[in-house]
Regions:
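C-terminal catalytic/acceptor-binding lobe
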Residues: 2-8, 15-126, 279-282, 288-377
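Conserved catalytic core of nucleotide-sugar-dependent glycosyltransferases
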Residues: 6-11, 192, 196-200, 205-209, ...
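Acidic, Ser/Thr-rich intrinsically disordered and amphipathic helical segments
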Residues: 12, 17-24, 152, 163-166, ...
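Short N-terminal or domain-adjacent regulatory/targeting segments
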Residues: 116-144
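Short, well-formed alpha-helical segments that are part of the catalytic scaffolds
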Residues: 132-140, 160-175
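Active-site beta-to-alpha loop of glycosyltransferases that engages the nucleotide-sugar donor
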Residues: 143-144, 148, 155-166, 190-192
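Hydrophobic targeting segments
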Residues: 149-155, 171, 183-185, 204
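Short beta-strand/loop segment that forms part of the nucleotide-sugar
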Residues: 180-191
Length: 377
């Protein structure tokens, strides 16, 4: 009897264990097929979307961009890991970029005294290779600081291509070291009539302002190269005379009222003197007229130290059709009477073309002819 009871008990236990195993097996199968179908569905969607986005998602690594240390199952599709925009979420509290500081009064990269020579051959291609940061039209803006002024450098010009190559070769690096925000404008007088330097400078002022909002204007002859980069090409509280010590004059100022070669005026100063005279045809006199305009309007000429304001001149013969102006002495004596009616307010010219080259902007103009000289009886 006891054996029969024991056998039935064992039979029930075995059936219970078998039933539990069967239940466990069924649960495992259900879970297995559920996960398999989910994975199949996910990979199907992933592969369907992959064909259109292969170039965008070439790898199978996925990350939580807002939580770098979190992990996810490798089978999750990119659409479930990325935000709705389809792009990684960036930190919305991005740091505000620091404002560009003002350029220092004395830039730290200046060299000082320079060796200037004109014996080596020069080409525009070489100058362009040397100045890759100069943009079209001969413009440059310091990348690491904010210049106080925007400077237009204006050169009166005719038949001086050889000199221009050397000028650009030396001046572009100097101006960049000086942290000048500048543009270079070559004002080319067309035709073979008598040259008029001051009128071309007026044209340069007018045309440069059409191109950009300049507040400082440097007027330079194309044959003068500064020998010291501490001679800073920007405007000052008073009209500035830069070329005070040329090799042509033994590195001395030829006379107290000399204002030739290279000079600079702010826009306000330029307008105060009504610009430059338009009636000085031929060589000489216009610089002295400009000096008179400055002093007659209550301003003074500022100059650098004579050891810094040194210049070398590229030697050349006097240009044809730029003979000395025989009327210059009479005109200089009448500056007070003529400066209000002869200047930027009375400027007339015909603009022929504007061409922007890699190293400068060329502006070709027709400025007319000088009036006929009076016949002496």
């Amino acid at each position: 009897m006891s054996r029969l009871m024991l056998g039935r008990t064992l039979e029930r236990i075995c059936k219970a264990v078998l039933l539990l195993c069967l239940v466990h097996f069924l649960i495992m199968m259900i879970l297995y097929f559920d996960v398999y179908s989910q994975r199949f569905d996910i990979f199907s969607r992933f592969n369907n979307g992959r064909g259109a986005n292969t170039s965008r998602w070439p790898h199978h690594s996925y990350y939580n961009y807002s939580r770098p240390n979190a992990t996810f199952p490798s089978y999750l599709p990119a659409s479930e890991l990325l935000p709705p925009s389809g792009k990684p979420e960036l930190n919305r509290s991005q740091p505000t970029p620091k404002p560009i500081p003002p350029c220092p009064e004395v830039p730290p990269g200046l060299v000082g005294r320079l060796l200037i020579e004109f014996s080596s051959l020069m080409s525009m291609e070489r100058v362009q290779r040397e100045n890759p940061n100069v943009t079209e039209g001969g413009k440059y803006t310091p990348p690491d600081c904010r210049a106080k002024q925007k400077v237009a450098i204006i050169i009166p010009f005719r038949h001086r291509e050889h000199h221009l190559k050397y000028w650009l070769h030396y001046l572009h690096p100097i101006l960049r070291r000086q942290k000048i925000d500048y543009g270079i404008y070559i004002i080319n007088q067309l035709g073979e009539d008598t040259f008029n330097r001051a009128k071309l400078l007026n044209v340069g002022y007018t045309e440069a302002l059409k191109d950009a909002e300049y507040d400082c204007f440097i007027f330079s002859d194309v044959d003068l190269i500064p020998m010291d980069d501490r001679n800073l090409y920007h405007c000052y509280d008073q009209p500035r005379h830069f070329a005070i010590a040329m090799d042509k004059f033994g590195f001395r100022l030829p006379y107290a009222g000399y204002f030739g070669g290279v000079s600079g005026l702010s826009k306000k100063q330029f307008l105060k003197i009504n610009g430059f005279p338009n009636e000085y045809w031929g060589w000489g006199g216009e610089d002295d007229d400009i000096y008179n305009r400055i002093t007659l309007n209550g301003m003074k000429v500022s100059r650098p130290d004579v050891r810094i304001g040194r210049y070398r001149m590229i030697k050349h013969e006097r240009d044809e059709h730029n003979e000395p102006n025989p009327q210059r002495f009479n005109k200089i004596q009448n500056t007070k009477n003529t400066m209000r009616k002869d200047g930027i307010s009375s400027l007339t010219y015909r603009l022929v073309s504007i061409k922007k080259y890699p190293l400068y902007t060329n502006i070709s103009v027709a400025i007319g002819k000088p009036p006929p000289r009076p016949i002496r009886g």
